[in-house]
Each structure stands twice: as C-alpha cells, then as structure tokens.
A protein has these predicted regions:
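Conserved, structured core segments of small domains
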Residues: 1-120
Length: 120
C-alpha cells in the first residue's frame, strides 16, 4: 500500500548553512535515509517545499468565484515543509520509517493514498 507522510515543522528552525560541516552532516543523514528507502523498496517520491510565505491559497465555493490569497491555508507555527510518498505493508511499517527520519523536531501526518493515476 502507498502512504503519504506530510512533514509539518516550525519554520523558525534554522537548518545548517550550506557549505558548513553541519550542513554536510545534515544532508548526509537525509541522503542516507533516502537511500535506505530506495534499498528497502519503499521509495516512491519526496520533496522539500519552499517556506509558507511563498504559498498561494485558492479557495473555491460552489457557485461563487474563487478567492486567491497570498500565504498558507492556515496560520500556524508549524507549516507543511515537505513530504514523502512511500510503499509499505501496513501503518506500523510506515511509523517505523517515520521514526527513522533524521528530523529532530516535527509533526508527521501519515495518510494512506486512495488513488494515484500514475501508479502501475
């Protein structure tokens, strides 16, 4: 079964600066984690999102014109920062994958994928 892991984190957290040893260690942990997903047959896709200040929200209502506003849908300290789509036997396996993610502080929302048009 396929699952989406939504990663919500505090945007005030500052990741290590590119070019520093801390950044290399930080990125190395993610590359190793991603490779472990690939090697384990779990990898489908993943992406890191731009900060919420770059978001645009479009609200639609039946019979009414759409409303377009700058910013995320919800104003919150924790914002959607990225996601993974993984293949796993069950929810327990996905939880184990999330627990291995090299992110020190975040909330992870796991949702089963009902349908993906490009799935084989």
């Amino acid at each position: 079964m396929e699952y989406m892991i939504l990663i919500h984190s505090d945007e005030s957290y500052e990741a290590p600066t590119p070019g520093t040893p801390e950044f290399e260690e930080f990125m190395g942990a993610f590359l190793a984690y991603n490779q472990s997903l690939i090697d384990g047959g779990h990898w489908i896709s993943a992406a890191n999102l731009q900060p919420s200040m770059t978001a645009t929200t479009v609200r639609k209502s039946f019979g009414a014109a759409s409303t377009v506003v700058d910013g995320p849908y919800a104003e919150s300290k924790e914002q959607l920062g990225g996601y993974y789509v993984v293949s796993a036997a069950d929810l327990d396996e996905v939880i184990a994958l999330v627990e291995a993610l090299p992110i020190p502080m975040a909330s992870f929302e796991i949702r089963p994928i009902a349908f993906r048009p490009d799935a084989g």
